[in-house]
Amino acid sequence: MSNRHALLERIIAESQRHYAAYVLFNQAMADRLGLHPTDLQCVALLNLEKGPVSTGHIARLTGLTPGSASRLVDRLEKAGLAVREADPEDRRRSLVSLTPGMSERIGQAWETPGTAYGEVLRSYTDAELELIADYLRRATQVGLDQAERLTAGG
């Protein structure tokens, strides 16, 4: 087995371990905040958005059906995590955003794990960080593409 082949196998195995650890972490964080893991992911994704988004956009971000995304937004509203307002450009559509102060609450919840992840990242050079960022962006797109393929029955 070539060194490259062994390295690729190692990366695949470490990626699987990373994903499993992230799923466990996400569940623990959701439990700590009293949320369903999907709801936590939606809150985290909304926190990354530049402004309010449609329920349809949330469906695309989360991989949920439009109906499931609407029920997710209902739960977030009921929990006081998000607000739904009429779209000023299309009154038939609503836009969803985090409630004021929610970004700070997310930041507080992420303070300890964020510090731990930050310590890991600080051990890399700028060039290595660029490579890691590129890999994560590209791997994320592969994941999204494969989820779409599987959802479409492919």
Where are these regions (language model features)?
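C-terminal regulatory/oligomerization modules of transcriptional regulators
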Residues: 1-3, 128-154
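A structural signal for alpha-helical segments
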Residues: 3-6, 30, 105, 127, ...
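Amphipathic alpha-helical segments that line or abut small-molecule/effector binding pockets
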Residues: 9-16, 115, 126, 130-137, ...
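Alpha-helical linker/hinge and terminal dimerization helices associated
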Residues: 18-25, 62, 105, 109-120, ...
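N-terminal helix-turn-helix DNA-binding core of bacterial DNA-binding proteins
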Residues: 26-65
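N-terminal leader segment of winged-helix/HTH proteins
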Residues: 1-33
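Charged, amphipathic alpha-helical coiled-coil/dimerization segments
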Residues: 74-130
